[in-house]
């Protein structure tokens, strides 16, 4: 569980799946979160350090250069990897996205990987699609995002809330 100070109180900003299953949510007071977490070694709480996150994401982007020369961090927790023209070096797009996913898993990260002809479609499918690995064929973008929630449009929270009503 990662926390930060907000108006003289500690609140949860991120939590692992284990803490989420226990009922811990972002924005919750740390005292409330602790009451939901059994006193076991898995219950680890520390102060969130966004600077460390940014440095780690940059380092991860550097490691991903083995897949493409065009890699950029997508803060707070993603990478853009432009694979245009690199598929043949990896024996196909399917093998390439599986290699990216496998590399992230070996480094201890969960990864959702999507390939599409546009960045917006790839981002939406990676973040909200039903599968952890996805290839959207050219011309199938509308079909791929049709059933995704409004949040997949990468709009401001206010705009997304308005559209969701």
Task: Please state what every model-predicted region is.
Residues 106-108, 165:
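Secondary-structure boundary elements
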Residues 86-91, 131-135:
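Short, charged/polar, Gly/Pro-enriched secondary-structure boundary elements
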């Amino acid at each position: 569980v990662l926390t930060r100070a907000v108006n003289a109180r500690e609140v949860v900003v991120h939590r692992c799946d284990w803490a989420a299953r226990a009922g811990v949510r972002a924005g919750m007071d740390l005292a409330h979160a602790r009451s939901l977490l059994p006193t076991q070694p898995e219950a680890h709480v520390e102060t969130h350090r966004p600077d460390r996150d940014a440095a780690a994401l940059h380092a991860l982007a550097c490691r991903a250069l083995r897949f493409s020369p065009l890699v950029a961090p997508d803060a707070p927790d993603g990478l853009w990897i432009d694979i245009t023209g690199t598929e043949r070096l990896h024996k196909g797009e399917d093998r390439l996205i599986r290699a990216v996913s496998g590399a992230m898993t070996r480094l201890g990260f969960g990864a959702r990987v999507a390939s599409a002809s546009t960045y917006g479609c790839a981002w939406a499918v990676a973040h909200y699609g039903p599968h952890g690995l996805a290839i959207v064929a050219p011309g199938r973008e509308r079909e791929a995002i049709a059933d995704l929630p409004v949040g997949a449009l990468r709009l401001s929270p206010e705009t997304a809330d308005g559209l969701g009503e």
